[in-house]
Amino acid sequence: MRGKQALKNMVASLLLQVIVLLSGLILPRFILEAYGSSVNGMITSVNQFLTYLGLAEAGVGTATVVALYTPLALKQTEEVNSILSATRKFYNKSGMLFLALTLVLIGVYPFFISGQLENSLVRWMILVLAGSTLVDYFFLGKYRVLLTANQEGYVVALIQAAGTIVNMVVSIFLIYIGAGVLFVKAVATGVYMLRLVLVKIYVKRKYPVLDFYAEPNEGALKQKNAALLHQVVGIIVNNTDTTVLTICLGAKSLLEVSVYGIYMMVVNAVNQLMTSFSNGLTAGFGEVIAKNEEETLKKSYSSYEYMYFVIMFIVIACMGVLILPFVGVYTINLTDVQYVRPVLGILFTLIVFMQNVRIPGLTIICAAGHYKETRYQAILEAVINITVSLGLVWKFGMAGVLLGTVCSYGYRSFEIVFYTSRHLVKGCAKKSMFRILRNVFTVAILCTVGTYVIPQEITSFTTWFLYAIGMGLTSVFFVVVINYVVEPDEFMQLRHRVNDIIKK
């Protein structure tokens, strides 16, 4: 049952990420050509600042998912209701705080970009972009955490996938007929809000005994402060770059943020793709840990890590070779700022590697609820990021900021590998490091050869796509073969596990 639910979640999440990836690649290009790099940079920057304000969520969602694992597994309906009631109260408080912080941002943000765009456009854009988060706090959040904890995240994923398609089609149509950027984003926010109705209908039918107004058990969310700390760190680490660029680069800040946003569009697409292979598994691992099935955990984790690393290094090999040609084609008609920068291509590829190599271990840490135990490591990650970024931005610009991100991700990712080995999946670090090193060596060779074989200046998406297919097939062949030769038993076990899940 766990395997089948995990497969459903993984497939639905993968579908969502593919759709989000396509939308994330297509829409910004229309926005760039219709409204220019400064507007695109402003939208990117505002979204990052709103992510900071998302700290108002205070770790409630993460803590709720962890708290629900055991009562859902043991079918303790009253306990589930009391936890969800407490979650509803916390989400309502978070929504009010987020609204207040948004109003503050509306007042101060225009001063950061003074003279680059009209203040009225910027202020209204902040309010429009904040709308979807407000809906999440006041209405959708409590349903989403329940479905995630009960291994039904695929429901939310499928509904969101449909909404993303509708949003993309409607937005492109509005841009095509000459609508203003503010109206386009307002309609997009409206489409996002509609998914609330579908999620609510599903939950009401599937869980008729739920009571979000039962006696709240706020003590069950004791992990929320520790989860909040990790959330704070995650937001700082993931959004420091845009914030530093916006504040420190003066009159050219929005143009540089636009360049950053195009590369991050690729990074986010890759990260979303990789996330689809872990999203559906956290709840399953949480159930295994809750039931103390140590041997099952060890075997399942090894298979998961093996599969994840194979996929991850295939993707990184392709990204390392193809990111610069892609950016060149994507921005071929834009002349207001230089987008193709080889150093950025290398640094963003390193960032993707450092971000994703931690995911298998992080999945287990989240499933076990080890937020308090890992808080100091998380704080150090944020300190490294901010310190190095601010120290290098004045001399090296965007490259200096990215070096700060590489350093912080590098420290934290490998610390997670060893923490998982010490406390959760005993003794797994040696195997993990061996897998990482052999795949890094393989990918380094693939990237070196690939950059000589594939032209780094391409003028059409068709040509780029054909080269991408060739690079993809080559990477799949070499990475899969090398991992099969080195660990044939793990390969066969993974294949049998997938076959068993599909047959069920």
Identify the residue ranges that each predicted region occupies.
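N-terminal membrane topogenesis motif
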Residues: M1-G24, E78-S85, V122, Q151, ...
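Hydrophobic transmembrane helix module of multi-pass membrane transport proteins
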Residues: Y91-T240, L380, Y452
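Helix-terminus/linker motif at the lipid-water interface of multi-pass membrane proteins
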Residues: L22-N40, F111-S114, I175-I177, I236-A269, ...
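Helix-loop junctions and terminal segments of transmembrane helices
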Residues: R29, A58-L74, T148-A149, Y207, ...
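Interfacial/gating helices of multi-pass transporter permease domains
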Residues: I31-L55, I83, V122, V181-V184, ...
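Interhelical loop/hinge segments that connect adjacent transmembrane helices in multipass membrane
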Residues: M1-A6, L182, V197-N239, T243, ...
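Transmembrane helical elements of multi-pass membrane transporters/channels
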Residues: K8-L25, G163, V184-V199, V203, ...
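Membrane-proximal transmembrane or re-entrant/amphipathic helices at the cytosolic face
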Residues: G427, T451-K504
